[in-house]
Regions:
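Long, structured stretches of catalytic cores involved in phosphate-ester chemistry, encompassing
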Residues: 1-121
Length: 121
């Protein structure tokens, strides 16, 4: 799905998400190349409505040669935490509901652009 050269976090259903990160070495695409979707919010394309939580988004008035906005994503899994009996000890305990965090960063500046946290059901 990331072939359209933009990054996004989309909630498809309560248990299904789609994440893409790109482009890394090529131009982004205009929103008009992607069905004129919004940058975020509800979007229906075909039979399914989805919730675009965040995306890179570029209007068609930007020359294609200027669409050079790389984005990368770091995925962090929080499934255990340290719960030592003594201050200098280590004891890993499982979270009852693990968490995954998708963190999108600007590929040129390294600044955080968006983060989405999901807890297991």
């Amino acid at each position: 799905t990331g072939d359209l050269h933009n990054s996004f976090a989309i909630k498809i259903t309560d248990k299904v998400w789609e994440f893409a990160s790109g482009p890394h070495n090529s131009n982004n695409h205009w929103a008009s190349d992607e069905g004129d979707r919004p940058p975020n919010g509800p979007f229906k394309y075909g039979p399914r409505e989805v919730d675009i939580r965040w995306s890179t988004y570029f209007r068609s008035d930007i020359p294609r040669g200027k669409l050079l906005h790389p984005t990368y994503c770091v995925v962090q899994i929080n499934n255990v935490f340290n719960n030592p009996r003594n201050l200098t000890d280590t004891r890993w305990v499982a979270f009852p509901k693990p968490q995954v965090i998708f963190q999108y960063y600007d590929g040129r500046t390294g600044r955080l652009r968006y983060a989405e946290s999901i807890l297991s059901p």
